[in-house]
Amino acid sequence: MKIVFSDGRDSVFHTEELPDTRTVDSVAVTQEMIRRAGDTLKIRFTQPIRNIHGYWTSEQYRPQMQLPWDLKLDSAAQRQMPFLVWFDQAGVSQSAFYLTDTADDASLHSQLSQSDSEFRLEWTIRLSPETQAFEFVADRRQLPFPDMAASFRQRLIPDNPDFPAGAWDPVYCTWYAFHAAYTIPELEKNAALAGELGFRTFILDDGWSYDTSKRLNSSTVPEWFSENGDWILSERKLPGFADHVKRVRDMGFNYVLWVAPFLTGRSSRLYAELKKANAILLESDDGSAAADPACPLIGELVIPRILEVFRNCHLDGLKVDFVDFVRPSLTIPRGRECLKLIRILAEQLRAVKPDALIEFRQRYTTPAMLPYGTNFRANDVPFDYLENLHRCCQIRMILGDGVPVHADPICFHPEESCVNVARHLIASLAGVPMLSADLTKISPEHLAVIRRFMRFYHDHLTTFRTGHWTIRYDFGHVASFTVENETEMIAAAVTEIPPAPAGKNFILMNLSAEDLPFEADRIEDCDGNAAAVLPPGGIAFQKTN
């Protein structure tokens, strides 16, 4: 396998040959090679299209069972990661390629060549003065493709950071329930009910920094984010907010506030200043704009204002959103600036509160961001428990065991069946459960299902927190997941029942569309009633002898 290195003008200055073996091989990109490349490095190589039937990058929420004519993956510290794996129909990897430089802006381009029966690949990396020596890795072992992502992660971060206990607490979030239309009495009524159900973290989402009260719909979308960006608490909407935070914390909650440091609204004062400084990277059709993280205003004004609210209101954490709004770019690279500001924000939050909770969203739940976050959440999937499952499993595949992967908030129609509510809860157990609903309007039957699964989560938290996770795929879809420790295995069956463990308790949850014949000591339906077979939304308990 020939690897060709060139500069931005396509002048080749280095080549290497890797053996055609089922091994892990790497090429060191030295400081001398970085110097010779200048500001742009290109790495070219090819992949024979032999027993390849699918691929996966972090851009996809599930593996793709087709061959792309033209594939492009842009990555930087704040969005996606420089990793690609090709696999066969059984999901066994045929090759994985990645860079250990995850901070710099990079773009991978793959083109299918019919005449040569191969993929022609080129990685372009925009280098910076801070770029250190790194590796280009070709892993051609034949293993289940999720193991390739694990190998990538372990090469970058051999050991996980320590995460605060609160990162494993089930979360109540206001977003789908209220959007930006809420009052303090409504928030506290829902906090009280959420606490009774077993939730221990309360996220106040968008809406706290402006007076307008609104729900997300076709009339509000065009200017939804227009008032964000100044990060000053709305005393009109939330009078006595610090006292409110104390009351909710006294109920046993961690209180977390939504922020978006790189997003500014077109009606904000900050937007005008950024515009004057030519520091707007992107205008969107929802009233928002992406602020340039290289602009001093972000570090000198935005982050201090966010920290001021955090300190003054005695908060427990921040939901740090839209970091990925700053897109990877070879012309305006901002990966390192984003990483620097997120690191500063995390350090200053932890200086105030060492166990501060910091939520990141899916596109930046990557090894590069692992040291700076505590809660790594699936991207938005309202009403869709199957996609929530897939997104939790993808983050788990990227970040591995012992990391607080969080489900996107569960939300469902008021007249949804209890079976489907149970399915929502089972899917969320691929991570830490999160819910967003006006609990004053939820039926007693739905509340009972939620309460039951929250009790199950708390009872088995040690396994979820410290166990080893296995995600099994079948033709591009999650077939099952398991998490196990020394004493028990917990599993969810979607299209298959995973093999039972030897000498351990086995708990099986049914996320499939049909009854599952399964021998167990106890089988319960979605409501907790005894059942003869394992129905959808049910749980079976098989004890070891």
Give, region by region, the residue ranges found by the protein language model:
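Aromatic-lined carbohydrate-binding/catalytic grooves of carbohydrate-active enzymes
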Residues: 168-172, 176-307, 311, 315-317, ...
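Alpha-helix-loop-beta-strand connector modules within alpha/beta enzyme cores
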Residues: 239-248, 253, 337-356
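Glycan-recognition surfaces
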Residues: 266, 271-300, 304, 343-441
